[in-house]
Amino acid sequence: MNLRIFLVVASLVLSVLLGLVLGQRGGGAPQAAAGDARVVIGLSLDTLEEARWRADRDIFVARANGLGAEVVVLAANGDDTTQVGDVEKLLTRGIDVLVIVPHDGKAMAKAVRMAHDAGVPVIAYDRIVRDSPLDLYVSFDNVRVGELQARYLVDHLPTPGRGRIVRIYGARSDNNAALFKAGQDRVLAPYLERGDITVVHEDWAEEWKPENAKRIVNAAITASGPRFDAVLASNDGTAGGAVQALLEEGLAGRVLVTGQDAETVALQRIAAGTQAMTIYKPLGSLARGAAELAVKLARRSVVVAPRAVDNGATAVPSVLFDVVTVTRDNLLDTVVADGFATYDDVYRGIPEAARPPRPGT
């Protein structure tokens, strides 16, 4: 029996109805009938060690449960072999749709093929799976994230548009790291070509680990001394490692540091002045939206996918959510107003007299 999943890929002028056929080739998992049977979603996560992913999981599960679906969650602790094994377990369990946050976007192509062999559609969550016949990609506009990081840095150098910087990329295995870099490159290119901005040191922070980011900043200081104006860090974890290195050199608060994810510790650094900005990615919208889309795919309903992203094998129907730049000036109007973080959490460690008025007072 063939299983047909319909996705509407919309543009400014037209909508195209795509019928993506997943052949159930032997031993397929039982599929949810449209609108009646209870949907079972398999959620395969790279890791739950970071607070960000625990938040995604909780919001996703709550929304899916609210729609009458069951979610089976497995986390691979950053190991590709474990994650492939997790997918095998989920397929054996009899899931109707697989949602995967890949540790390695290329390695998990095998997991997509396994799911399709079992007649199960696959959604890549936040990180795309490369070189695979992926059914749907749900994420943020990650090139835009990099553009916003670099634009803020350029505009807020001591002399706007001129300076010496350190660049910290993310994990090479994470396709998002390449997208963030592409967005940064797009903004920085003319300044680098003119020689207005100089990159004194750059490297990849493998596994996104703060300690690797700290080593990159330490290497920059060893190579060129503390003569740089900013650190273009690609997320809040690497920003934290950069800030630690700067603290040890007495440079924290004097060197601009970027970030991403609006982690609580990063918001606290922004309030304290040791990190300049972060990118707020409304996880609630992403996780709830992905849960809704997963249920629709499991029930063979029409899904509207306004974008398409090339994963090396196909143009994957994609739903990309927008992001917001957060600085000390708009903490209250963004993450606090949205309920993403509390006033007390953000300003913990800041003397009462130095805090802005509490909302509602």
Place the predicted regions along the sequence by residue.
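A residue-level marker of the well-folded mature domains of exported/periplasmic proteins
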Residues: 2-361
